[in-house]
Amino acid sequence: MPSATSIASFTRQFRVLVVGGSYGGLTAALTLLDLSRGRVARFNSTPDAQPPQRQLPIKITVVDERDGFYHLIGSPRALASENYASKTWTKFEDIPALRSPDIRFLRGSVNSVDCQSKVARILDAHTKETRKEKYDFLIASSGLRRVFPTVPKSLRRDEFVEEAKKHVGDIHNAQDGIVVIGGGAVGVEMATELRLLHPNRNVTLIHSRDRVLSAEPLPAEFQERVGSILREAGVKLIFGQRVLDITAIETEGERRLWKLELADGRTIYAGHVMNAVSKSVPTTSYLPEEALTEEGYVKIRPSTQFPKTLPNADSHFAVGDMVSWSGIKRCGAAMHMGYHAAVNSHQLMLSEDSNYKPEFINLQEVPPVMALSMGKTAVTYTPDSGTKDGEDVHDVMFGEDMGYSICWNYMRMSEPFQA
């Protein structure tokens, strides 16, 4: 129970704009809901942590192009299993932990942010009109712009369920096998999921380099082990080749056939092609250029705040895949950052009382780590433990649903909001 004094001592309501309702954004929002009500944040792992001594009047606005939380990690299975797909997308209004009068969700996209005036311009997906939204604190967590099949094309849950259904139908009709192009994390997981869920379909993975995961700063031992598990799963591997052209061939009935031309002159035919090659780019076009690196990532301080050179920098935070920070982009890192941004912004709110000095928590440098779900097994790498794999590793890292329950329960999203 809260052990905080009345909110009446604060003369105004704090307006927080969260851009992006995925792992980092929702973690930040949930943390602020806890702290503003005088509770220990649900993500606080500090032993004997004490709740804030004061409650705060707060209004959180979350802007997202989607109408709900989508479990991005589960994409390789969601696009191969209709039943699983329906589980991975939950509309924001159906999440018990977010049914609070202190938070609202707006489906749309942010076009621009004026750090000086603290005003964001938002394109409302429903009205198709641009509106101005004033804020006191901004937490940018809109991630990377990814393309299908890394993420679904749909922006609404009902559309996504139909999209997944059609995609699974294409797999069932792929009598001439399936080709996955790209040996990054998504391509690797997708190929093994297809073999697990559709064992009667031949699956071929084509990658332009000599090893899978060639773009990641990971040891050769890890990459080679992933390649071995792909082969053990029955995936045919073609390394060192680029696909130059893909052509649809006319067939009778529902059977579809695709012709793929490789750089070495070979021709391959498949009933279904999944292109998992794409360069994800940060969704930061709405932010000032001074806050971004040349690649478009947000430059942040260890507190997750914008660089000091920007106006009102202390009131602007960025978290997750869109920021320039060490380590491989992962949902765990995004949630970790979201917690930091929320705690530090809450400290600044408390500091409006002249007697309170804010105490920030800071990010530490993160080494490259990775965990891949490959059918019934998983492969992990950390600098301390090296490469590990096995069904027991899969159970710990992903459970039975590609980490959905682990993430959902960690955020405690089934627990009803308590006033």
Where does each model-flagged region fall?
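A Rossmann-like FAD-binding core segment of flavoenzymes
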Residues: 101, 105-108, 112-113, 200-302, ...
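FAD-site-proximal beta/loop scaffold in flavoenzymes
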Residues: 157-175, 267-336
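Intrinsically disordered, low-complexity domain-flanking/linker segments in eukaryotic proteins
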Residues: 36-58, 251-259, 309-313, 353-357
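Predominantly flavin-linked oxidoreductase catalytic cores and closely associated redox partners
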Residues: 154-239, 246-247, 324, 336
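FAD-binding core/adjacent interface of flavoenzyme oxidoreductases
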Residues: 2-19, 100-179, 276
